[in-house]
Curated annotation (Swiss-Prot):
Residues 464-478, 724-757 have a biased composition (Polar residues). It comes from Arabidopsis thaliana (Mouse-ear cress). Belongs to the WD repeat SEC31 family. Required for protein transport from the endoplasmic reticulum to the Golgi apparatus. SUPFAM superfamilies: WD40 repeat-like (SSF50978). Residues 457-499, 722-757 are annotated as: Disordered. Keywords: Endoplasmic reticulum, ER-Golgi transport, Golgi apparatus, Protein transport, Repeat, Transport, WD repeat. Residues 487-499 have a biased composition (Acidic residues). Interacts with MAG5, SEC13A and SEC13B. This is Protein transport protein SEC31 homolog A.
């Protein structure tokens, strides 16, 4: 490709070490079209944002002589350092690059000592105040720019070390007192500047034009010749100068200039009289890229240190070109292969250092951040940081988890009360207030709910009034001052004698039905009801119903609904705005499952009418977690104003779990599953991996969506992997009885209807004591509580102190102190277990020989047969050859027998999931084919996917497979 920027000059170049400027000094011996003999030093700005191809001139000045070499160092009073030029007359000119706003380059002074053109010139990078110069008189001068009146060191070879014209010199990159110089007579000398002594030298028969120290290996140096007969570049070790380390072959004529890449020592730039400018891979000696071939050769090349991959090349035909090396071809203009593709083809594992990140960071799962910095002493050192971006949220989660672990309703009521006080909206205040009521003591929830809705019993109001002295006094005064006058005498009610006679005749003959009809005709409702009562049940009921139908009083509709036990019909006739009155009525009269259905129906009506808050509260009363979470989830985005998404999810999760304490729901809706997924992600992102795993364990594996399964696996893999090994080893120990592991207590309902749904949330710690045991039913299923400090990782088998999955539980997330939702009175069941009764002897666990397999499905029978055969093949050969003691052999055999016996019992009872049974069938088929490798792979797959269900016998099965394979061999 063509150059990206250019300058129309035939000049030597020096690039500023820190600033985007390039200096150009007129080349000695160059002739332009104007045949001018002037000498100029100019500074151009390297502005790659500009669309102009020509660089902008920002400063210039005239020089007394033309230049043979130009260098730009960082030493100087200004931030741009100093420019040094090796002149034809033997002087060294010093310039201040930018001395004023006018852009004039200020000439500082000349350094005079040499008696011939100065061709070698370089600042010491490690000691910026030192400038080395070499001239045609064969001398090398070291100038201290702090005191430049004379050279601080004067180096000149004698005898066999005599050098002719100095063509190039270079400071060692590792030792600031070591300098190398080369000359046209082929002599290269390594100097100890401090002692002005020669360390070593190299004599060749060819002219040496340029040399460069290896920036990485301080004992290696590059030397090139400008003779056409020897156009090679040699890398020499100063300890073994007669044998080059590497030779770079590519130029057809002599090499004039070269420079090592300051950004990556893997690359070297050379130019020669064959019109080629080549970039080399110094590790392999191969050509990496090449500049487009011009009409004439380049005599000066440099790397731009501030932008790796950008180079400058000065040509004899009067042009300074700025090139992007990455756009150059690999083998010249004839083969336009891109620089990048050549790199990948030549060394696919190596990239330029400027493409590599000097530092980097990456966020990891579990609130982790990993970072690296290539400038550190240890290149392979990385840092792992734990980040909690929501510190206030982490504190909230910890407090909420502590409230759940406590398991006491007082702490949960305190949480609800605190949330009610902190609520920023009326909706939140109403929600938390209702949740607090649902956690009240037995018998109080019903009364509290009605009071919360604004309806109290008269006795409650009288009791409250009696406690107020001023109210008592006022009521007494009213009784004294407002006296009802006594009637002077009874006045007979006027009536039509005709109706009276007709009614009387009907009664005389016993025609009660006609008498009632006559009373209705005369609008004597009370008389009709009295006569109907005498006339029998059928007449009484028909008369009563007719009276109710004729009545216009609103309260009579309530009476009708109660008499007909048809609250559902009455509910659908109610106005949505009167939902509190309707809910209070249901709370008073509904019983059993009717409470749930009525609350659900009322909530549905309210939701359809747009009363979202009222519908939510009714769903809460019904214990309908799914519907409640659906509504809360829909309003999640609306509530996010002023709060982060994580805080909104935390609010929603807190309400959901508190609601779950008083309900039972075996179903997991999509909204609830999504809520758990979002909450687990938030917990994991804040580094709360163990807490996230606890909540995910509340869900049965069948309830996991693909996304949730992936999240669970990531969390389980991130958790302590050694927990699986620890738990697997403990499976061989005898099982110890644990009351909280073996029994689950379902509390009796409160004084109102008990929801029929079941939820799957449980207290974080086992209840310390079960009070009022007579209110609890007989334990039904396993109860696994949660222990923060001892909870195993996901891939460990469940045990004491861990959550139990939702579908394996009946009891809600409660202990003896947590009430259920509002419910009508139900007679508590007497527990079948008594403390004083001696427990029955525990039956021995099933073994391979004793397990009942009569009910194992036909397609699973081969599993029993294959594993029984594997058991026999595993232990029978060991009885005569094992080094273990007989007791240990018997213990191992019995343990494996018990594990398989437990598996056979699960198969017999149908307690194995479909996925586990299918994998187990595949495993046994592999065993039947003697393909133990495939069997082990299936066992490993089950370990990662079915561990919760199969952890008790999977390790034993693996041992048997491994032993069986060894026996076959």
């Amino acid at each position: 490709m063509d150059c990206i920027k250019s300058i129309g000059r035939s000049a030597f170049v020096a690039i500023a070490p820190e600033s985007p400027f390039i200096a150009a000094g007129t080349m000695a011996g160059a002739v332009d079209l104007s045949f001018s003999s002037s000498a100029n030093l100019e500074i151009f700005e390297l502005d790659f944002q500009s669309n102009d191809r020509e660089l902008k001139l920002v400063g210039q000045c005239q020089s007394s002589e033309r230049f043979n070499r130009l260098a730009w160092g960082s030493y100087g009073s200004g931030s741009d350092g100093l420019i040094a030029g090796g002149l034809v007359d033997g002087n060294i000119g010093l310039w201040n690059p930018i001395s004023s706003e006018s852009g004039e380059i200020a000439h500082v002074r000349d350094l005079s000592k040499h008696k011939g053109p100065v061709r070698g010139l370089e600042f010491n990078v490690k000691s910026p105040n030192q400038l080395a110069s070499g001239a045609d008189d064969g001398t090398v001068c070291i100038w201290d720019l702090a005191n430049p009146s004379k050279p601080s060191h004067y180096l000149k070879g004698t005898g066999s070390y005599m050098q002719s014209e100095i063509s190039s010199l270079s400071w060692n990159k590792g030792f600031q007192h070591v300098l190398a110089s080369t000359s046209h007579n082929g002599t290269t000398v390594i100097w100890d500047v401090n002692n002005e002594k020669i360390i070593t030298d190299l004599k060749t028969t060819v002219r040496c034009s340029v040399l460069q120290w290896d920036p990485d290996h301080f004992n290696q140096i590059l030397v090139a010749s400008d003779e056409d007969s020897s156009p090679n570049v040699k890398l020499l070790d100063i300890r073994y100068l007669q044998s080059p380390v590497r030779t770079f072959v590519g130029h057809q004529r002599g090499v004039i200039a070269m420079e090592w890449c300051p950004s990556d020592s893997l690359y070297l730039l050379t130019c020669g009289k064959d019109n080629r400018t080549i970039c080399w891979n110094t590790k392999t000696g191969k050509i990496v890229a090449e500049l487009p071939t011009g009409q004439n050769w380049n005599f000066d090349v440099h790397w731009y240190p501030k932008m790796p991959g950008v180079i400058s090349a000065s040509s004899v035909d009067g042009k300074i070109g700025i090139y992007n090396l990455e756009g150059c071809s690999s083998y010249g203009t004839e083969n336009q292969q891109h620089f990048l593709f050549h790199l990948l083809d030549a060394d696919p594992l190596t990239a330029p250092k400027w493409w590599k990140r000097p530092a980097g960071a990456s966020f990891g799962f579990g609130g982790k951040l990993i970072s690296f910095n290539k400038n550190l002493p240890e290149a392979s050192e990385v840092f792992l940081h734990s980040l909690a971006t929501e510190k206030s949220l982490v504190n909230r989660i910890s407090k909420f988890e502590a409230a759940l672990e406590n398991g006491e309703k007082t702490s949960l009521r305190g949480l609800c009360e605190k949330k009610t006080e902190e609520a920023e909206s009326e909706e939140e205040k109403e929600t938390w207030g209702l949740l607090k009521i649902m956690l009240e003591e037995d018998g109080n929830a019903k009364t509290k709910l009605r009071s919360h809705l604004g309806f109290s019993l008269p006795s409650e109001e009288n009791d409250q009034t009696a406690n107020e002295p001023h109210a008592t006094c006022s009521s007494t005064n009213v009784e004294e001052t407002q006296k009802v006058p006594e009637p002077e005498g009874e006045e007979e009610e006027s009536s039509d004698p005709t109706f009276d006679d007709a009614i009387q005749r009907s009664l005389i003959v016993g025609d009660y039905k006609e008498a009632v009809a006559q009373c209705f005709s005369a609008n004597k409702m009370a008389d009709a009801l009295v006569i109907a009562h005498v006339g029998g049940t059928e007449l009484w009921e028909s008369t009563r119903d007719k009276y109710i139908r004729m009545s216009n009083a609103p309260y009579m509709k309530v009476v009708s609904a109660m008499m007909n036990n048809d609250l559902m019909t009455y509910l659908h006739t109610r106005q949505p705005k009167s939902w509190k009155e309707t809910l209070a009525l249901i709370c008073t009269f509904a019983e059993g499952d009717e409470w749930i259905s009525l609350c659900d129906a009322l909530a549905s009506n309210l939701m359809a009418a747009g009363f979202t808050l009222a519908a939510t509260l009714c769903y809460i009363c019904a214990g309908n977690v799914d519907k409640t979470v659906d509504i809360w989830s829909m309003s999640l985005e609306k509530q996010s104003a002023g709060k982060s998404y994580a805080e909104c999810v935390q609010d929603l999760m807190e309400k959901t779990l508190v609601l779950a304490l008083t309900t039972c729901n075996k179903r997991v809706s999509a909204s609830l599953r999504k809520l758990f997924e979002s909450y687990a992600e938030i917990l994991a992102s804040q580094g709360l991996i163990a807490t996230a795993m606890k909540f995910l364990k509340l869900l049965e594996s069948g309830d996991f969506s693909p996304e949730l399964s992936i999240l669970r696996d990531r969390i389980s893999l991130y958790a302590e992997p050694e927990a699986a090994n620890t738990s697997a080893s403990t499976n061989t120990q005898p099982k110890i009885s644990n009351p909280y592991q073996e029994k689950s207590f379902t509390p009796a309902p409160l004084s109102n209807a008990q929801p029929s749904r079941s939820i799957t949330f449980f207290p974080l710690n086992p209840p310390r004591e079960l009070k009022n045991a007579d209110q609890y039913q007989q334990p039904t299923m396993d109860y696994h509580s949660f222990n923060r400090s001892a909870g195993p990782a996901y891939n460990a088998p469940p045990g004491p102190g861990s959550y139990r999955s939702i579908h394996s539980q009946v009891g809600p997330y409660i202990n003896s102190k947590i009430p259920q939702t509002v419910a009508p009175p139900v007679r508590p069941m007497t527990p079948t277990h008594q403390v004083a009764v001696q427990p029955e002897p525990v039956a021995p666990p099933p073994t391979v020989q004793t397990a009942d397999t009569s009910n194992v499905p036909a397609h699973q029978k081969p599993i029993v047969a294959s594993l029984t055969r594997l058991f026999k093949e595993t232990f029978e050969p060991l009885r005569g050859y094992s080094r273990d003691t007989p007791a240990k052999k018997r213990e191992a055999e019995d343990n494996c027998s018990r594990k398989l016996g437990a598996l056979f019992s699960k198969l017999n009872n149908g307690d194995i999931s479909k996925n586990a049974a299918e994998k187990l069938t595949q495993l046994c088929q592999a065993l039947d084919k003697r393909d133990f490798g495939a069997a082990l792979k299936i066992q490993g797959l089950m370990t990662s996917t079915e561990w919760d269900e199969c952890s008790s016998w999977l390790p034993t099965l693996k041992k048997m497979i491994v032993t069986g394979r060894q026996n076959v061999r």
